Amino acid sequence: MSSSSYNTSVIPSSSSSAQPFFITSSGTGDNDFNRKDTFMSMIQQPNSSAPPPKKRRNQPGNPNPDAEVVALSPKTLMATNRFICDVCNKGFQREQNLQLHRRGHNLPWKLKQKSTKEVKRKVYLCPEPTCVHHDPSRALGDLTGIKKHYYRKHGEKKWKCEKCSKRYAVQSDWKAHSKTCGTKEYRCDCGTIFSRRDSYITHRAFCDALIQETARNPTVSFTSMTAASSGVGSGGIYGRLGGGSALSHHHLSDHPNFGFNPLVGYNLNIASSDNRRDFIPQSSNPNFLIQSASSQGMLNTTPNNNNQSFMNQHGLIQFDPVDNINLKSSGTNNSFFNLGFFQENTKNSETSLPSLYSTDVLVHHREENLNAGSNVSATALLQKATQMGSVTSNDPSALFRGLASSSNSSSVIANHFGGGRIMENDNNGNLQGLMNSLAAVNGGGGSGGSIFDVQFGDNGNMSGSDKLTLDFLGVGGMVRNVNRGGGGGGRGSARGGVSLDGEAKFPEQNYPFGRG
């Protein structure tokens, strides 16, 4: 081929330089569709010649129903020299290894050849009768698998990890563990670190259960330590509590500094007979802590119908009546301890339990004063007050002992600081006169002073006309006049460490709860 002809055939002439170098045919759209079909057939052709899918193995424990079931003894299954050489008695685990060994002895040997025909498969039973794989329907499909299963589940764990002391029955498991042991740690939310995943999972199960249990049952509240019962009957050391009036541990957290310890020096004996309980002091110490959180409730009463205003301003110790009374929880009374009210002629009087603590220190004693006559003359009452004064001079604990009865319209209030009871008449003038007489007998009485007509000594912002508090701790709590009408006459002091000026002064060693 000449150069001119090459140039003519390859390089277009100058006259046709405006035409493109590659000239596409301007045929119809049928040619384009034919090309697409040819291209798609070329792509799909290799897939059409894909090899047939492989036969899947049966899952462990689900053998082929047509398989041959082989049951080997534990000795045979765990034997390391199952196949023995006839020449040197050397054992081998597999028959193929024995055949290869026979070549060294110039003995005829034969390896298993793959057969073109279908070979009947074998399944192996676990020799342990209690194992699930002892059932032919749960047999394992290969000899190695049944061996490892028997070693892991029923055999001795001979291989031990030096790092975590975990033991393995199969050497391959031990080697695999040794490669990763100590390289990864598992940290629980509680801060405990584990090197083993199984230990971590076990710990998390207990830790999560503990967290859930703590969320459902928080810290044991003070209620669980308080014996509560409905109506009458024996109760705990903190008194008989009505429904809904149980103590809560939140109250303790709100008032951390009150330091209440009622068990020092006292023995609380609960008697179920006669629906009452006995409070027996272990010593002659009369100091029992009954102090209001607001300095207003040494003697806390529930108001009755006749002297509502008086009861709202003062507090007297309240005890249960001889008959059943209905205790109901209430937060209207703001005393630290609100003690059960006890009326002889009212069978269903309701006691207002406090919002802070609910208790009625039932210091009931079986004396003859309970059944005394309701009509007592003024002379008898005066004689009783005189006796109280003489006894109080020698024993401060008998300060509130006596005064066993009142008139028909009186409301009975049992105050058991020394074991006796005070019967307060609704006519406050009678009680005022009795208290004045007692003060006169006890320490050279004044013109109108009462043992309850006192003032606050340490608290300058509180006057005697505002509060009625007898503080047995000696921190300045006072008791003011019951009637709010008693004069401020001279106040005497009793013997035995009791002062009638309103401050109960006792020897230092007689403070079982410490000085406030």
From Swiss-Prot:
Which residues participate in Zn(2+) 2 binding? C188, C190, H203, C207
Q: Where are the zinc fingers (CCHC-type)?
A: 186-209
Molecular function GO labels: DNA-binding transcription factor activity; sequence-specific DNA binding; zinc ion binding
* Residue window of motif Nuclear localization signal: 146-153
The record ties this protein, via SMART domains, to: ZnF_C2H2
SHR-binding: annotated span: 196-208
Q: Specify where the region named Disordered lies, as residue ranges.
A: 1-68, 483-516
Give residues where Phosphoserine occurs: S73
Pfam families of this UniProt entry? C2CH-3rd_BIRD-IDD, C2CH-4th_BIRD-IDD, C2H2-2nd_BIRD-IDD, zf-C2H2_6
* Cross-referenced InterPro entries: C2CH-3rd_BIRD-IDD, C2CH-4th_BIRD-IDD, C2H2-2nd_BIRD-IDD, IDD1-16, Znf_C2H2_sf, Znf_C2H2_type
Question: Is the keyword Zinc assigned to this protein?
Answer: yes
Q: Which parts of this protein are zinc fingers (C2H2-type)? A: 83-105, 124-154, 159-182
Indicate which residues the UniProt annotation says bind Zn(2+) 1.
C161, C164, H177, C181
Q: Which UniProt keywords apply?
A: Activator, Chloroplast, DNA-binding, Metal-binding, Nucleus, Phosphoprotein, Plastid, Repeat, Transcription, Transcription regulation, Transit peptide, Zinc, Zinc-finger
PANTHER family per UniProt: PROTEIN INDETERMINATE-DOMAIN 4, CHLOROPLASTIC, SERINE/THREONINE-PROTEIN KINASE RIO
**Name this polypeptide is given:** Protein indeterminate-domain 4, chloroplastic
Q: What is the organism of origin for this protein?
A: Arabidopsis thaliana (Mouse-ear cress)
